Amino acid sequence: GIPNRKLILIGEAPGYYEDQKGEPFVGKAGQLLDKIFASVGLSRQKDVYICNTLKCRPPDNRDPLPDEKAACREYLDAQIEILKPKIILLCGRVAVNSLLGTTQGITKIRGKWFEGPNMSKMMPIFHPSYLLRNDSREKGSPKWLMWQDIQEIKRVYSQMD
């Protein structure tokens, strides 16, 4: 993404396809993410800067180790400092744990606003790969909850200069 975005999304780490292309969220999860943003008139090309907590993929797609998160944290903090976003979306458990320092399950804290760096607002959201594994759109399902969250994100985004 290009700097000077009011909205950034922080994911976990590059996956296989992201490693190949050198861009975050380019596989099926990224395609779903693009559709989610498009549903409220946002696009990755002009509205959203996307990055990851980790800058390289852990072997065998395992959870990152604490020292791996720590090694990348300075770089992530620098990205946030340079971009000075108004809204930071924490996409998935690893991003939530890294930036909020909580081990609470994302289902309990998704959709809630937290104070972020530089007077920003942070919101944990479901990772699109989780949504791909949970296909139901019934009220209360992960996809239904994500729809509620993206509408709240758009509402707050629209109120910012």
Model regions: which residues?
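A polyanion-binding, active-site-adjacent surface
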Residues: 1-161
